[in-house]
């Protein structure tokens, strides 16, 4: 018998803040050192891919692009579209360039990895539960994984990727799960889901009516796919029906935040190791 998922792309109303910096290295030619029209056309093309160009900077042989994206866009898709459309625009302009095979993609946000991890770690304390015994009980469902370092990149043949996501799921109707079995299932099953999908959970806080997860994603999977994987699999393992709202929050974060990227426009960019 076919098991149909409880959650799908077309029934979601997500909230998201997804931003990435892309760096490519030119080995031959000059990148769009001509008119601003070329960048305007590129922005329109990238928009059709679900990538909004927030900023661009060309320094020596380095090209730095900052995008915001929709949840259906994965890091590997960004890598392909960023370089592919840039090379095509150069060729059309009569100034073809050659890029290094390797690129760098970093997830960035308004908060750093330290801030996100600290926020998740403090969930129980920040809720201010009146019942101290219940607070102590909940602490066991907040887990920090010391073996997972979100500051380290995923190395591939095509470059280096930092793909860090903060995912939040909320129970339907803010229904509170307070039983040991249910909370344990969410905590332990989240790690099993991550292992199967090739994600790496750095921090998780299972609360009565929501769950926070900070993780490194599979580069081939979009934030949307990752959210749906947790929604569907956790609901299946809980055996309580559609326990989650048909929505989620997902945001990117990294070693440094958007403020550092904004400052890069007025300062010399630090070289990234290829």
Can you describe what each PLM-predicted range is?
Residues 1-274:
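Charge-rich, low-complexity N-terminal segments
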């Amino acid at each position: 018998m076919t098991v149909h998922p409880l959650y799908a792309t077309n029934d979601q109303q997500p909230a998201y803040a997804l931003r990435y910096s892309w760096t490519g290295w030119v080995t031959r030619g000059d990148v769009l050192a001509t008119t601003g029209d070329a960048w305007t056309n590129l922005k329109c093309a990238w928009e059709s891919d679900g990538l909004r160009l927030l900023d661009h900077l060309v320094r020596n042989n380095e090209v730095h692009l900052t995008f915001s994206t929709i949840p259906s866009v994965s890091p590997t898709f960004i890598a392909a579209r960023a370089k592919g459309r840039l090379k095509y625009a150069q060729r059309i302009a009569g100034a073809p360039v050659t890029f290094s095979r390797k690129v760098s993609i970093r997830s960035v946000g308004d908060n750093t990895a330290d801030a996100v991890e600290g926020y998740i770690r403090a969930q129980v304390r920040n809720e201010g539960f009146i019942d101290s015994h219940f607070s102590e009980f909940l602490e066991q469902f907040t887990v920090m994984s010391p073996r997972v370092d979100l500051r380290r990149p995923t190395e591939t043949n095509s470059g280096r990727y930092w793909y860090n996501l903060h995912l939040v799921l909320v129970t339907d109707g803010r229904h509170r799960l307070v039983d040991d079995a249910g909370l344990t299932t969410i905590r332990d099953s989240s790690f099993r889901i991550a292992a199967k999908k090739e994600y790496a959970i750095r921090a998780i806080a299972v609360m009565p009516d929501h769950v926070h997860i900070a993780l490194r994603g599979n580069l081939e999977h979009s934030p949307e796919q990752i959210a749906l994987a947790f929604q569907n699999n956790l609901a299946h393992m809980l055996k309580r029906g559609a326990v989650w709202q048909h929505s989620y929050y997902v945001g990117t974060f990294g070693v440094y935040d958007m403020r550092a990227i904004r400052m890069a426009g007025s300062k010399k960019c630090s070289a990234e190791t290829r």
